[in-house]
Amino acid sequence: MSRVKRRAWLELGLVLATAVLHFVFQTALHLDAPYIAAAVLFWTGYLVYRLRAAGQARAWGLRSDTFAASLKANGVLLLVAGAAMVGYGLSRGRGCPPPHSLYLLLALYPVWGLIQQFIICAIVGQNLQSVFGSRIRAVAVGAALFGAVHLPNWTLCMLTAIACAIWMSLFLRWPNLWVHGFSHGWLASLAYIYVLGEDPLAAVRQMFNV
């Protein structure tokens, strides 16, 4: 097995461990917020460590030459999906007027969105494409895995699987983590408020009694 394939399997294993631990901390221990913070620190550290290699930043989408194309594609996704989610939520009496937490989510969620896109697209997507030798297989498997992470919430599972398939397809064609981080963060914020009718910051406020 080549060094590239070994690294691909190693990184996919790390992602699988992250997903399993997320399921345990969220469903069994009810410590979702602390786990997310720990996951952000771990993957940020791994990203910084690997960026020492020449050309790695470009390979992972930390680049400017794909910015315009990625922005255009993700902009269309954001407008269409965002409008659909807001329209759905308003028809259900959600988010009118928008809760204050929405603005905080729109400001902060892109940070977590960038980390998730790094894991989903740069790590899982590119490594699956390397392992399978097929973009279609990589997208199908990646979307299924990302959706499964959000079980037992089937609504969130389906939403995230569809979103992952679109994001991964766009990233493998126009890799740009900066654009994908904001796209993920803003769409996820709208999904929580207008589709799921949930406030993901409630757990944080409860943890700190604010």
Residue ranges and their predicted role:
Residues 31, 66-67, 71, 98-102, ...:
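Membrane-helix interface segments
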Residues 26-28, 57-63, 89-101, 201-208:
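Membrane-interface helix termini and inter-helical loops of multi-pass transporters
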Residues 16-24, 81-90, 143-152, 185-196:
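Aromatic-anchored segments of alpha-helical transmembrane domains
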Residues 24, 48-57, 90-91, 170-173:
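Structural signal for the C-terminal ends of transmembrane alpha-helices
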Residues 157-210:
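Functionally important transmembrane alpha-helices
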